[in-house]
């Protein structure tokens, strides 16, 4: 596949479906772009474009929810950039076989997600939920803890986020096992894990791990990948942390293994239905930590994402290959 785009012979037209600070609009315009921003709020139905997109070249949107039906209004788009790492909403057959290039924000969220994951590991290891639970009743008693330097962490989905998690876990002295689709493909994170194995070894890894982190994308292969059969392969009394995608877990099965205490606890940042419905029993379970798909966020989130997009736009103008090109067949 040729990733370089044809040099622009006209003013490139960028259509942005997110509310971004004016400073970034000005930077793009200074580079010669025509920029139109029409924000699509998270809690809104998809708005119809209020401008003519016939000559639009580039769309900046959220691949986690935008199915790109808007391309019917923008037939000449060459490049779509997703402000999210996930692009599952875009993966329709017609679009997957098109020539439109897709890039995502991979790398922009790795550090905050890794820091969130380590916070959750430490929360369970030091018994912090018990401290919070005991305080209103003024209960003073020994709280069981786990020493991380003698614990094993399994990172399922050893990509950029998984590597960032492993790096920080190693600093705490943990034994780290990375599990990925292609364990022989070098990605620069080999020295962050004690061992890297293929997905065919996942059951062996789960049986060994005291903490298991899911950092998987949403694809046909990963949907409901983590079901009751797989959860029961996990070490009894271990913990599950999901910072990948909600639909990789069968939630009803997770509830079962938490209630029967096969697993000691779970920290979930992503869910099959978001926002998590108020009546969902995860809210009531003492051994479940719920975060509102917030692990990715940091005060620098916008800065990192827009700098990546601007860097890529400069490459586009120079007819050079873009960063973070997504394989539309694989979904990542």
Model-assigned labels for residue ranges:
Residues 1-101, 227-229:
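An N-terminal-biased, well-structured beta-alpha scaffold segment characteristic
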Residues 2, 24, 103-116, 130, ...:
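C-terminal helix-to-coil terminal segments
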Residues 11, 34, 152, 174-175:
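Residues at the starts of beta-strands that form the adenosine-phosphate
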Residues 39, 83, 101-108, 200, ...:
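Short beta->alpha connector loops at strand-helix junctions that form conserved
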Residues 57-58, 79, 211, 239, ...:
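Short, Asp-centered acidic motifs that coordinate Mg2+ and/or phosphate
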Residues 97-152, 164, 171, 186:
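Phosphate-binding beta-alpha-beta segment of Rossmann-like dinucleotide-binding domains, i.e.
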Residues 158-159:
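Glycine-rich Rossmann-fold phosphate-binding loop(s) that bind the pyrophosphate
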Residues 183-281, 297:
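Rossmann-like adenosine-cofactor binding region
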